[in-house]
C-alpha cells in the first residue's frame, strides 16, 4: 500500500536535469520540500532544491543519504543501478520499483516483457557474445543498454557489422510515432495525454495534441499502456512509445518517468505530467485529465536565438532550463495552443 505524503514533507529526486527541475517546480508549488542528487554542482534542478547532494548516481552511500533525508524518492531517468535501488527500496519509500528499472534498462528484456503481454513489437534478434548472425536484410542495431536520442544505434546490412550486446530491430514502414503518457496513482491508471511526435536527427523536435492517429489506434495504444502499468509494481508517470506502421500499433519502448513529449501537458492538459507524477508518488488521487489542441517544439542549443525571436513575435509559452547552450543539447521548449507549424528549417 502506497504511503500518503502530504505537503510540507520532503521529496527526493535522483537526477538534476530538466525533468528533475520541472518535477521540483511542481512539487514546490504544492508545498513540498525538495532534495536533489546529481553529479553536477551546476545542474539546473539545484536552484529549486532545499537540500542538494553532489554525487555520482552509482555512489550508494550518497544515494542512501538522500533516501534517509526524504519521505519519498523519485528519479528523472532510468540509468540508475537497479541492484542498488533494489536494496534501498526494502528500507525506504521508493515507488518506481527496481523491477521496472531492470526491465526498461535493457532493450531485449523490455521487448520480451511486451511480447509476454501480447503487445506487438518489431521483429528482433538479440546478440549476446556470438556475432555470427545471418543478415539478409537491413536492421537497426541498438546497444541493449544506455541509449537515448538515437545514441548507440546504427543501420547495418551485413554480418560483419554486427556487434555484441546489441538488439537488431527490423525496419518497418513508419507512418507516425505516438507516445502515451500515463500515470498510476493509488487507485487507477489515468491517461495524461496521447501525443504525436516528430524527430529530427533522432531527437524529438515537435509534438502535438491531439494526434492524427485513428481513434482505434489511440484506443489500442492506451490499452497496451494500461496493460503494462497493471503488470508493474509502480506508481507515478510512465510513458510508452509506439510506432504506427501500415495501420498497426507497434510497441517501441517504455520510459518509467516523466517524458519529453509530456512537456506539452504544461499547457495542453488540465494537469501537467509533473504535477500528476508528484501526486501519484505521494499517494494522492490524480483524477481525470483533459487536453486541448497544443503544439510543442524542443529548443536545442544551436536554435535558441531563433526561438527567442519566435517568442517575441508570436507569443506562446517559453520554458528555458537554465542550461548552457550546446549543439543538439535540449535547453528548453516552447508550447503553442493550436496546431502550429513554424516553417523553414524547423518543419
Residue ranges and their predicted role:
Residues 7, 279-347:
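Peripheral (often C-terminal) accessory segments that flank ATP-dependent C-N-forming ligase machineries
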Amino acid at each position: 500500500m502506497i504511503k500518503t505524503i502530504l505537503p510540507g514533507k520532503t521529496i527526493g529526486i535522483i537526477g538534476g536535469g530538466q525533468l528533475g527541475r520541472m518535477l521540483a517546480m511542481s512539487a514546490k508549488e504544492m508545498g513540498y520540500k525538495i532534495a536533489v542528487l546529481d553529479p553536477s554542482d551546476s545542474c539546473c534542478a539545484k536552484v529549486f532544491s532545499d537540500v542538494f547532494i553532489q554525487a555520482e548516481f552509482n555512489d550508494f552511500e550518497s544515494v542512501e543519504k538522500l533516501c534517509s533525508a526524504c519521505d519519498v524518492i523519485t528519479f528523472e531517468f532510468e540509468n540508475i543501478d537497479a541492484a542498488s535501488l533494489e536494496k534501498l527500496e526494502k528500507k525506504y519509500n521508493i515507488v518506481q520499483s527496481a523491477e521496472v528499472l531492470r526491465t526498461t534498462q535493457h532493450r531485449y528484456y523490455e521487448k520480451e516483457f511486451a511480447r509476454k503481454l501480447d503487445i506487438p513489437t518489431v521483429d528482433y534478434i538479440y546478440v549476446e557474445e556470438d556475432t555470427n548472425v545471418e543478415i539478409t536484410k537491413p536492421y537497426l542495431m541498438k546497444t541493449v543498454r544506455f541509449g537515448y536520442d538515437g545514441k548507440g544505434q546504427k543501420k547495418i546490412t551485413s554480418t560483419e557489422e554486427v556487434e555484441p550486446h546489441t538488439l537488431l530491430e527490423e525496419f518497418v514502414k513508419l507512418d507516425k510515432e505516438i507516445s502515451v503518457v500515463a500515470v498510476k496513482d493509488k487507485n487507477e491508471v489515468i491517461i495524461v495525454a496521447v501525443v504525436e511526435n516528430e524527430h529530427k536527427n533522432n531527437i524529438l523536435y515537435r509534438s502535438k495534441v491531439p494526434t492524427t492517429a485513428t481513434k482505434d489506434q489511440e484506443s489500442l495504444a492506451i490499452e497496451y499502456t494500461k496493460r503494462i502499468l497493471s503488470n508493474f509494481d509502480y506508481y507515478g508517470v510512465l510513458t510508452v512509445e509506439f510506432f504506427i506502421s501500415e495501420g498497426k500499433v507497434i510497441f517501441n519502448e517504455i520510459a518509467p518517468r516523466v517524458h519529453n513529449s509530456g512537456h506539452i501537458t504544461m499547457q495542453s492538459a488540465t494537469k501537467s505530467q509533473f504535477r500528476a507524477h508528484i501526486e501519484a508518488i505521494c499517494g494522492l488521487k490524480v483524477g481525470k485529465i483533459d487536453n486541448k489542441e497544443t503544439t510543442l517544439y524542443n529548443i536545442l542549443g544551436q536554435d535558441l536565438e531563433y526561438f527567442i525571436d519566435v517568442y517575441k513575435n508570436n507569443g506562446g509559452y517559453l520554458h528555458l532550463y537554465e542550461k548552457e547552450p550546446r549543439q543538439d543539447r535540449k535547453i528548453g521548449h516552447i508550447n503553442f495552443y493550436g496546431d502550429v507549424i513554424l516553417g523553414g528549417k524547423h518543419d
